[in-house]
């Protein structure tokens, strides 16, 4: 990735300010209208005060350097992956110079403080809706969660409620039938002494000696050892409506994202954006993917992926993606301290 950026930077040094403006205009116009862009169109939608012949010469240079291409003779130009990468990098510079106050995104004030699953669902759907893309959000690994409290609540002579509360407000509850009268308050106290502060993984791996072979360990295993889908998704319908993608493209994407190692390879430091061929999969060259991690304090606990057509609004998508990652990190950091 760094090698690609280095090559792009070297090519950009060969462009003057006017040629950069022409390239920016071509990519923006193509993203908006999805039609090849002519030199005349560049003059119509920009403030570049040069002749059409000058713009055509600039476009020839941009084509030679691999930023745009001409699908057929007499047609306008279409940006290549390299041209789209230029546009994204330019928009990133602009977004850093503008105030965050103009980010028209819904806030997370309505987030239910005790239900991280709903928080992730809300975040995924919000991200998908605002970017018109397909979103995958990795759930925090249940095994890494610390147990905060165990509760035994008698509800009748024969039944009691067994509840385990973990970090982020994740709660597991089950009714159990009792055949004898015991001091449930004392048992609850002992369970809390043994389990509080330990991770779910430690319990499931049998690292608590005094629980080995007990009915409570089997109960805990059945309660918190249940399998959960690693990812939740949102926005597949957005790709189905995108005129630059075919059903075959979307089927290919859904097949590729089943590969856990592939998804992990997309994530780097901060927000990583891969466009077309940069993704490294032939079948995904029509896509762009944004990826990044969300945190609990300094520790990453999950990844977020946004897949769109590579003909997309990179400026908007980057800002919304960054916003969602920051809000998720704030939420999980604050709830872990409660």
UniProtKB/Swiss-Prot annotation:
GO MF terms, alphabetically ordered: DNA binding
Keywords of the record: Repressor, Stress response, Transcription, Transcription regulation
Signal peptide: none
Domain of life the protein comes from: Bacteria
Transmembrane segments: none
Keyword check for Ligase: no
Biological process terms in GO annotation: negative regulation of DNA-templated transcription
Database matches in PANTHER family: HEAT-INDUCIBLE TRANSCRIPTION REPRESSOR HRCA (PTHR34824:SF1)
NCBIfam families reported in the protein's UniProt record: hrcA
Protein family: Belongs to the HrcA family.
Protein function: Negative regulator of class I heat shock genes (grpE-dnaK-dnaJ and groELS operons). Prevents heat-shock induction of these operons.
Protein name: Heat-inducible transcription repressor HrcA
